[in-house]
Amino acid sequence: MAATRIQPSTREIFTTLEYGPVPESHACALAWLDTHNRLLGHYVNGMWLKPEHRNPAPCQDPITGENLASCLQAEAEDISAAVEAARITFKTWSQLPGTARGQHLTRLAKVIQKHQRLLWTLESLVTGRAVREVRDGDIPLAQQLLHYHALQAHAQDSALADWEPLGVIGLILPTSFSFLDMMWRVCPALAMGCTVVALVPPSFPTPLLLAQLAGELGSFPGILNVVCGPVSLGPVLASQPGVQKVAFCGAVEEGRALRQTLAGRGATLGLALGTESLLLLTDSADVDSAVEGVVDAVWSDRSLGGLRLLIQESVWDEAMKRLQARMAQIRSGKGLDGAVDMGARGAAARDLAQSFVDEAQSQGGQVFQAGDMPSNSPFFSPTLVSGLPPAAPCAQAEVPWPVVMASPFRTVKEALALANGTPRGGSASVWSERLGQALELGYGLQVGTVWINAHGLRDPAVPTGGCKESGSSWHGGPDGLYEYLQLLGTPYRESFLCESLNYDTFGLAVSSSLPSGPETGPSPAPPYGLFVRGRFQSPGTQSSRPIKDSSGKVSSYVAEGGAKDIRGAVEAAHQAAPGWGAQSPRARASLLWALAAALERRKQVLAAQLERHGAAPTVAETEVELSVRRLQTWATRVQDQGQTLQVTGLRGPVLRLREPLGVLAVVCPDEWPMLAFVSLLAPALAHGNAVVLVPSGSCPLLALEACQDIAALFPAGLVNVVTGDRDHLTRCLALHQDVQAMWYFGSAQGSQFVEWASAGNLKPVWVNRDFPRAWDVEVQGSEQELSLHAARTKALWLPMGD
């Protein structure tokens, strides 16, 4: 009796041309786990730590459910030990010449190349991602990151001579992010002289392997320390003494909670939130190429999240038909199968996608899925949702992997309104064969990265980040380096947490000015009004507050602004912002020059005003002269705020754009009332922002005097100055959801409140934590730090080829 033939014959294979399995062996990954007896701990200071009495968490194959190993979950003392090791190593690592650090990173890149099979096998095995994406994408890019940042370290001593490393960096990664996301943040931190403590999920041991490879280089084992534990331990890591910055990747609500928890603790916070991306398909696009772009964006295991797809109505039917046909060809299977397009992400990701699809159907959406999957399957079919009303909750919610939510649009203006109408601003691609239309959409999208006729391109030299609720931190390119640097001489960031600060009542108890007796001198001048919408006007409270001179006598009155006045000022700024942002650099520069000339003509009056408030004559004259010079400095720099070309390893240029933040709130310090006001106003205007300012509390008259010239030169509503109780106005601005960024220079309690309140719309904030700033020193008053905070970066990719 003939044996039963299981495998197809060669003729059948060439007739059907069906895919067959191309399995990769996971023997090397299992062998590495066996060397640890299938029990992993933490990697700290070049050693494996397996403390007793720790709860183990399983590390499972997300497809088969097989228990591959167990990983001990960290507790507070484990994190403290890792931070201490990083802090001690920082003292020597940061003092090394940049050349030596660059050589160390190059050696690490060679070690990764040597052990790349182990890395991509382990990563694919434990995450379920398609092995070809990890092997052909993640590992080569990780090596490129190390080589690029090694070169940046070589140039640090000359190109970044005025900057110094921050210190110990805390990195928090959730389960949905890969080891490559860790590399994007670890490489610039190490290159600039920082050391890293990473908190990673216990179910993903690849970061532990990476730390082991770095530790085995021998010279500086404590530069990269990895502890395993849930995201809930993030506040424990962030609050450790010595941690100067926390980089967090994860969900929006987790980032919002961490922002509030870290308020007042001294460490800066860099957020990269959400995973959704956007794709705009116009009627002039190559539809087949755009469909492949959708596959790359969400169904190729390159992306971590879902996709919001906007299709022009004239090609809606054709695009949807071709997309559904392409979905039927996508192969799901084990990640270690080389012929698989899409693997599995585990039960949590599958349940989240199913919940979103069920909710979308209940709200009127139409669902198309390529193939049926059993309810107990670890895989989730590629899913296309359409027909949702624009007001449906799912139409505004973040789209999870592997779901595409499609919506039609008619015009470019409508496409921008739909695309920018969500609180997320991560990445997007524009598909159009008309370059002018593509650039118009690319410039108009409120996101951090835009690809033209491509999706998901990455290069170490190109900055990647986001805006709005996607976070405001950057990695890659020069922007990623500044995330881990501070100006020379910046005070050490210690915790300034005020435990007694009541967030519910801060700024609500407005101090009242009681009569102090009969006036014996000449009557003070009539009170200044609030400067809103280009003119002085009475405050909503119809009250004023006294301003005293150096002798303690009342010299004048200013308006007592409140919440109603802040609302009006922010509304006026929003109306003026689009027009000012669209102005050419030459037009903005000419107005800044004109303001400098106007203040110079009135320098004697302004200096006399400063003298009445206690400034020595020479100091007052110097402050006015520096203010004029500061305006002139930023007027000359306006031309440098445009786009620059970035060289990458791919064919085609990348435009690095510097875009306005929008409406910027600024609370000025009490010291240097004229110079600080101008030093903060000038870069904000130079970069195209509209501004709402609270001037010096002790001497606001100089700012109001300058507003007389601002009213004659600048568009109405572009600059708004509100006087009153600083804490109360700070509260109103920090809690305002339409303020898109905020700078605060005041008390430690005010800095803490601003950081806490910014979690509402996750606006980027810059606070001084009660440390005085030398505004008369050029480096602190007009240098690159102000420019970095005054605008956001957008990378616009223009790849070439068919």
UniProtKB/Swiss-Prot annotation:
Transmembrane segments: none annotated. Interacts with SPG21. Residues 513-554 are annotated as: Disordered. Belongs to the aldehyde dehydrogenase family. This is Aldehyde dehydrogenase family 16 member A1. InterPro entries: Ald_DH/histidinol_DH (IPR016161), Ald_DH_C (IPR016163), Ald_DH_N (IPR016162), Aldehyde_DH (IPR011408), Aldehyde_DH_dom (IPR015590). One of its GO terms (molecular function) is aldehyde dehydrogenase (NAD+) activity.
